[in-house]
Amino acid sequence: MTSDFIQMISDWRDSRYSQTMKNLVANKTPCGAFLNDVSKLQMFRNFFKASKFNLTCICVMKKEDKTFEPEEGEQIVALEEFHSVNPKPKFMFVLGGFFPLMFMDYFKPHGTKMFFNNGRSNAQDVYNLYMKHLPELYNVHEMLADEESKKAFRSYMNARVTNVLNDFRFAPEPQYFLEGFLPANGDIAIDGGAFDGATTIDFARQGAQVYGFEMNADNYKNCLARIDNNDSGGGCHVTIENLGLSNQEGEESYRPGAAGSRKDPNGTLTAKFIDLDTYATRKNLPRVDYIKLDIEGAELDMLHGAAKTITRYKPKMAISAYHRREDLWTLFNYVKSLRSDYEFKFRHYRIDCTDYLFNDKQREIFRKFGLSYFCPSNCEAVFYCK
């Protein structure tokens, strides 16, 4: 194994989340709690007391939220007062949702790292799974085409084990827009998981003929409206299908969730699905040059349903690889089994929340503290293939 990969595995002995928790207690390391919702105060305090952590700082959103008294050893500060805290907590704990994760960059200059809220058991499960599948993970790592991919891949694995948000390595370019892996002018592109049509329009502006697939009926309507209200550029043809992509044609249940709608046998709604091989034949597509997939854990199913298309045309692909823990190796291995001549890269992105996820009031708060609208998280990991 290469030295960097070996070093990462070796470091996990002390850096994995469960061991870090033990070290925090043993060393009485100063820790903080970021309470964007003060109603969770007692929950936080109970957690810290039960875990025997050294809680030295409770940080609330604004001065008006300082409505409770500090307990022994605690400092209560508003976010804008955090610079005055001494000693600074080494780690900040947060609870629930994406909103508190946005403040990673605010705490970072003060030397305070942030745990993202997946919990001890989740991180331990990831660690156990990764250790079980080290040969597969190492194989993927070694097959990545550039050093940046390897660094991003190791960082992604590492952060999932440490549960430290700062350990991720986020790419600078817009998601799906890695140079060399984009649809070109005249390409036939598949947008699997079109959501609101934004990526469909982006690909059309590259000059591609785009076929977008969205199983959620409400999202499908939003796609149509967005495309009607936008110049997709170059007079390029865009088709939006109210279909999900899968390994076969049929009807299945799904659980609605805006950007997170996913197939679920216990789901409350139903949608029609189709495999890409059947769709391409039925629509007489002369070829497929590009595929983007973000379909909430159904990526491997879809790839099985596109096996003939991928084998025949070797399209460039951008495949989301974070919905299932095993995506880091199963997606890679399957694509490699279809075409051994694929080149692979890996990137991890912040969530673009410019017009998504947060409301105007929350965005105003981000601006006040000099933060972007891009949310750091464990989501948005992408395998690129060409």
Descriptions of predicted regions:
Residues 1-57, 61-386:
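Phosphate/nucleotide-binding beta-alpha loop and adjacent structural elements of enzyme active sites
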